[in-house]
Amino acid sequence: TQIVEGFRSAYELEESYRIAHHGEEIMPPEWSPSEPIEFVPPADDSAIVIYEKDGVTVKTFRVNHAPVEPSVGYRIEYAGKVVVLSGDTIRTTSQLEHSRNADLLVAEAMNKEVVGAIEDINRELGYEDQATILFDIQDYHMDVSDVGALAEEANAKQLALNHLAPKPQSGRQANLFFRDPVAELYSGQLLVGKDGMQIVIPVP
């Protein structure tokens, strides 16, 4: 609730300007408010339903992004199709359980070998604060090897990598840092996500 209220407050003026500029017919005011859905994630590896409407079911399960607490992933079900969002996390048994046979698994990915190399360079150059951050972030994200193994064991039909670290600066880096190492472990359809990407899953 706190986060949603913060976003609403931050965008309140922006929304009023858009409505004033385009008119209520184009920008209906009732579309503006975001309503938080409060829930307590299960303490174990189970999932709970947090949304159910018009055939869409959204479930949530606990993941591990300590010290961020709670941290969750999501399983979205519609017309027999399943999309799973890993959330920010290391690999957990709950992820495996709720990603099984997903039509699409969207999972964060970090190439810790490359991040570690960047950390070392920063330390050698005397950038201790930056080096410390690069060291710290490795303990609460999934390495590319974890992601590939998870998707393969879960039998996910498609895997889309997101929240990439380090951010690739070219298609070659995207392949070298992410696609290639994940593909060594995952045999399904693999996508390296980018802003604006749309993935269509046909339903019956």
Task: Describe each model-derived feature in a short phrase.
Residues G73, A79-V84, I90-G193:
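Cap/insert and terminal regions of metallo-dependent hydrolase folds
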Residues T1-V84, I90, Q173-P204:
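Binuclear metal-dependent hydrolase catalytic cores
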